[in-house]
Amino acid sequence: MADFEDRVSDEEKVRIAAKFITHAPPGEFNEVFNDVRLLLNNDNLLREGAAHAFAQYNMDQFTPVKIEGYDDQVLITEHGDLGNGRFLDPRNKISFKFDHLRKEASDPQPEDTESALKQWRDACDSALRAYVKDHYPNGFCTVYGKSIDGQQTIIACIESHQFQPKNFWNGRWRSEWKFTITPPTAQVAAVLKIQVHYYEDGNVQLVSHKDIQDSVQVSSDVQTAKEFIKIIENAENEYQTAISENYQTMSDTTFKALRRQLPVTRTKIDWNKILSYKIGKEMQNA
């Protein structure tokens, strides 16, 4: 073991540790971090070398965070990354410091947002919050209005999770929706992601994603927001239904094909008869 450690550079150790961390299942970051910490056995190297992995994990997972003094939770995403460890809360028009290891927000400060997109962002945010409240009991959302390559763009992010470590499973839903304000019709692009980990007496993961392409009629901000939400609702319902139907098909066909219906003799075993034979034989030998 010592020879192996001598051959592996600190840079390579950090690279391996970062891979483990960024691939941690939802709700299991702390467990993976603690295991990696034991393996690496160098806290300074881990914190300094793998800090980017902590940030990448939280942004990839759309980690929700509560900011003291504000009611709504905001999602940690690449779209809200302001640099230097600060993130944007576009709903409350503030920025805040985020500790990627402790997953805590601090130092909220007023933050200017793009005024040209304020009405559009607010309309989409209001409509999306109502949708998430109806469809995701544990869901959160954050909507951004940004100029990307000179085009005014709305980006809507949704996150919902269920962490049940006592029942040996954790899961998370993520979806990201974008459209550019270009009348009369705007292209809508999205990616939907599901990740579930079940680990009682085994280790099974569901990792699924689907890309969406659609279009929305651009009129007023409020009406466009309504049409945008209709597209989101239809696509996400179809995706969840398809996942459920796929599992039912697998249960009815694939999983059944994995086990033999009859033994090699092609004859069913009468276990009751075998048991009576065994009892009779034991009585004879008594």
Swiss-Prot record:
It holds the Pfam family F-actin_cap_A. It is found in: Cytoplasm, Myofibril, Sarcomere, Z line; Cytoplasm, Cytoskeleton. One of its GO terms (biological process) is barbed-end actin filament capping. Keywords: Actin capping, Actin-binding, Cytoplasm, Cytoskeleton. One of its GO terms (molecular function) is actin filament binding. The keyword Cytoplasm applies. The keyword Metal-binding does not apply. Present in all tissues examined. One of its GO terms (cellular component) is plasma membrane. It comes from the Eukaryota. F-actin-capping proteins bind in a Ca(2+)-independent manner to the fast growing ends of actin filaments (barbed end) thereby blocking the exchange of subunits at these ends. Unlike other capping proteins (such as gelsolin and severin), these proteins do not sever actin filaments. May play a role in the formation of epithelial cell junctions. Forms, with CAPZB, the barbed end of the fast growing ends of actin filaments in the dynactin complex and stabilizes dynactin structure. Component of the F-actin capping complex, composed of a heterodimer of an alpha and a beta subunit. Subunit of dynactin, a multiprotein complex part of a tripartite complex with dynein and a adapter, such as BICDL1, BICD2 or HOOK3. The dynactin complex is built around ACTR1A/ACTB filament and consists of an actin-related filament composed of a shoulder domain, a pointed end and a barbed end. Its length is defined by its flexible shoulder domain. The soulder is composed of 2 DCTN1 subunits, 4 DCTN2 and 2 DCTN3. PANTHER family: F-ACTIN-CAPPING PROTEIN SUBUNIT ALPHA, F-ACTIN-CAPPING PROTEIN SUBUNIT ALPHA-1. Belongs to the F-actin-capping protein alpha subunit family. This is F-actin-capping protein subunit alpha-1. It comes from Gallus gallus (Chicken). The gene is CAPZA1.
